[in-house]
Amino acid sequence: MNQPNYYLLTPGPITTSRTVKEAMLNDWGSWDQDFNQVTQTVRDKLLAVANSQDTHVCVPLQGSGTFAVEATLGTLLGPQDKLLVLMNGAYGQRIANICDYLKRPYVCIDTGDYLPPDPNAVAELLRQDASITTVAVVHCETSSGILNPVEAIAEVVNGAGRKLIIDSMSAFGALPADAKKLGYAALISSANKCFEGVPGFGFALIRRDLLEQAKGNAHSLSMDLHDQWAYMEKTGQWRYTPPTHTVAAFAQALREYEEEGDAPARLARYTRNRDQLVAGMRQLGFQTLLEERWLSPVIVTFLSPADPNFDFKRFYQELKQRGFVIYPGKLTQTESFRIGCIGKIDTPEVARLLQAVKDTLIAMEISLS
């Protein structure tokens, strides 16, 4: 099958470089010392990106990013814990859903699809409910594209003597996530987002002292991050068959990440992409879901036009025929679609996308001006 190579303008999987793809051409023995060294290099680099080498450990886990979120919650939350979930989209809702499966007690602050959580409301609830031990927040809620104020939330949570878990799936690697400044108990992300690797594993950066205390908490053998970490520390190996090709590709992606200039350079490129995308789409007549101040450099949600000729399925296929894959909306109340700003793309690709959108509107006989 000769599959066309599209630009993936999504929050992950994303467009990867040819050299990242080529890194998957070799086979690796899962217990071989060479592969163990690749794993250790990856773990060390991720800790360095978060400025957390002295306080945290990196525990990779096979599967999607949600696997890593569930594993972290299941490992760190004991029966005596109660979680406050800050919810403003699908991924905050997913954390609550995981807690339902885990049978861990939780409460929510839900601010809907359009607004970030209010740190003052968080502080007030923590004052009122002494049984809350931990707070979970999504760094970038990609169902809307909103960037949540993790710095202000971290200050409130740490000031109240509670623990903070950050789902930084679509932000870590570009947005600041300094462990010393934010003081989080755990930060979770995956290979196929801002580091521009391919899907196959997620990872958690967890405070060493908390992980050491978490032995026996886990609800699942394969998702026991304490056991995964202890086994890696002892043997250098993954407990069960690792995604060898994905790890090798991620190691190459990390080399390219360093060559580009690490997080500041990546954030600058994604921000350029976002600014050009938003300006161009507005010029074509589209409106963003969010106010300017809440727009993230990861993904932007646009409102579907009211024109009766607009049909998202056709819009999607027309763009796909022109080489671009976008995302449908994930909102409950509003018809929308999403376009990502991350991956191995820069302003020339964004310009080509905008021309493709313009051509698609003409083909669909839609006028937004």
Swiss-Prot record:
The modification N6-(pyridoxal phosphate)lysine is found at residue 193. Coiled coil: none annotated. One of its GO terms (molecular function) is 2-aminoethylphosphonate-pyruvate transaminase activity. The keyword Transferase applies. InterPro entries: Aminotrans_V_dom, NH2EtPonate_pyrv_transaminase, PyrdxlP-dep_Trfase, PyrdxlP-dep_Trfase_major, PyrdxlP-dep_Trfase_small, SP_NH2Trfase/AEP_transaminase. It catalyses: (2-aminoethyl)phosphonate + pyruvate = phosphonoacetaldehyde + L-alanine. Its EC number is 2.6.1.37. Its cofactor is pyridoxal 5'-phosphate. One of its GO terms (biological process) is organic phosphonate catabolic process. It is an enzyme of class 2 (transferase). It comes from the Bacteria. Keywords: Aminotransferase, Pyridoxal phosphate, Pyruvate, Transferase. PANTHER family: 2-AMINOETHYLPHOSPHONATE--PYRUVATE TRANSAMINASE. Homodimer. Involved in phosphonate degradation. Belongs to the class-V pyridoxal-phosphate-dependent aminotransferase family. PhnW subfamily. This is 2-aminoethylphosphonate--pyruvate transaminase. It comes from Hahella chejuensis (strain KCTC 2396). The lineage of its organism: Bacteria, Pseudomonadati, Pseudomonadota, Gammaproteobacteria, Oceanospirillales. The gene is phnW.
